[in-house]
Amino acid sequence: MSLDINWSLLSQPDESATDQLSESLIALLNAQLAEAHRPSFIGPITVTAFDFGNAGPDLEVKDIRDVWRVFDQGDDEGDFAEEEKQREKEREERDKLRNEALKSSLDGERYELVDRYSSTEGTSSFEYQPEYDIHEQHGDDYRIRGRRPLSYTFGYPHDRLAVHRSSSSRSFIPFPFDHPPPALHIPSTPGLNPSLVSHPISARFSRRPMSIAASAAPRPTPRRRPIEPSSTSPSPPAHPAGLPPKVSSSSIPSLQLHLRLSHASDLHLTLLTSLQVNYPSALFMALPLKLSITGFQLNADIVMAYSGEKNRVHLTIVDDESNPAHKEDKQIPLGQRLLSNLQIESEIGHADAHVLRNVGKVERFIVDVVRKTLVDELVFPNFHTVAL
């Protein structure tokens, strides 16, 4: 089955739309060429002009079948590689944040008497409460001052309790002859845990660094009010029972087309680059090079597969040995069989000084590079995938 392509629609009747399409293709080609690997003696490559020409391709549909499994497997490998790169990047960021958090200078480390029942971690905002000052019974000047994190309460707005750091040289290490501080008596308030009052202050507070105390303090087990069974009802299931999970897919089914392409094109493509001499130093000399492709002859068997599940198109070229023309030209290299003719016009040098035109060796070299790239990148088992 043959397909008729109206190639003239690319240039008529709206030329402005054709110009926009050409500009978008030029921008796409320049973006791809900027990332492509090139030899050290070839400078940056830039596309400056593009024209579709008037001659269109001849397409013949040979077969329609299911998508080859190799396309989906190769696509999954590419997805897994991208996901692994993303996970590695996230892992590096987490390690970096963890290392920065572990960095701590012992010089100037502050010590606080931290309540081991406190659920507040790593806060540095404190409030002084003079109404909770407690004097020892033997006339000692040492006092326990009301200092607590602002975010912690006993269920009462002013129940904040901590121990102030002493600015004197008195040691906080307990000795046998020291008198223990009296237990703190807090008035009865609703919602206050009696266990917090039953322990003396010396048993509820410990002297440790703030960074260590926040991580080492055990958290109190929250009390949960039992819920009556009659007051709640089971939530509906996320997916109805007995039905398979919903699979997102495109409305277009997956299919694969085997096409025979024959294209004697008269398109026009202009590229600018340079020939660089890197001896005795880098970029010791550079010669401007202008290449103009004025036509080519392409004969190939193309496989185009569409994956409706992932909405992607896979494209590759196959070497069909059953083709009679290929049997006669078996001694010809594959690249030359696919691209039998490529017309190139070359200019080397500056236009305002001296220019060498149609240098045969340069043109043959460019043709060989194009054929080799075509075989290495598009001939099966190599293929390109386009995400729509």
Swiss-Prot record:
Compartments reported by the entry: Mitochondrion outer membrane; Endoplasmic reticulum membrane
Basic and acidic residues bias: start-end ranges: 83-101
InterPro entries, sorted: Mdm12, MMM1_dom, SMP_LBD
Region annotation (Disordered) ranges: 75-101, 209-249
Coiled coil: none
Membrane-topology descriptor: Peripheral membrane protein
Pfam families given in the database record: MMM1
Bias kind Pro residues: ranges: 234-243
A Gene Ontology cellular-component term: ERMES complex
One GO term (biological process): mitochondrion-endoplasmic reticulum membrane tethering
UniProt keyword terms in alphabetical order: Endoplasmic reticulum, Lipid transport, Lipid-binding, Membrane, Mitochondrion, Mitochondrion outer membrane, Transport
Cited PROSITE patterns: SMP (PS51847)
Molecular function (Gene Ontology), one example: lipid binding
Protein role: Component of the ERMES/MDM complex, which serves as a molecular tether to connect the endoplasmic reticulum (ER) and mitochondria. Components of this complex are involved in the control of mitochondrial shape and protein biogenesis, and function in nonvesicular lipid trafficking between the ER and mitochondria. MDM12 is required for the interaction of the ER-resident membrane protein MMM1 and the outer mitochondrial membrane-resident beta-barrel protein MDM10.
Subunit structure: Component of the ER-mitochondria encounter structure (ERMES) or MDM complex, composed of MMM1, MDM10, MDM12 and MDM34. A MMM1 homodimer associates with one molecule of MDM12 on each side in a pairwise head-to-tail manner, and the SMP-LTD domains of MMM1 and MDM12 generate a continuous hydrophobic tunnel for phospholipid trafficking.
Family: Belongs to the MDM12 family.
Name of the featured protein: Mitochondrial distribution and morphology protein 12
